[in-house]
């Protein structure tokens, strides 16, 4: 199972090829997400961040893609127009003019309006990501002093 550092490295690789780029095509395996393919196509990727083992892809269209690799999920990055030889099941594809970011075998993918992403059940339970370069002691302090987390242990 991929752990936090592996997800952080995947986010860094994805950021390198996706951030600042417009999506020329979007694919979701899940029927529930198919309607978002047209909505997200043409959106520019603003940021890719991790929250624990979740990866959040923020778009300028006001949506954020939440993905969690679970046990077997794996990201592959290939040049545009290419597809890796694999027996894994493609769950999501984010295409730009130069690259494709392909998520295989993951079972937890959602698209939410960015303003409510923190309401996602997984994200609502966890604190800030310690691997986030933008994390400050003020954010940690605010979280620890919040009603929801007051009097809870850190470890």
Where are these predicted regions, by residue range?
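Extended, highly charged segments
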Residues: 1-63, 84
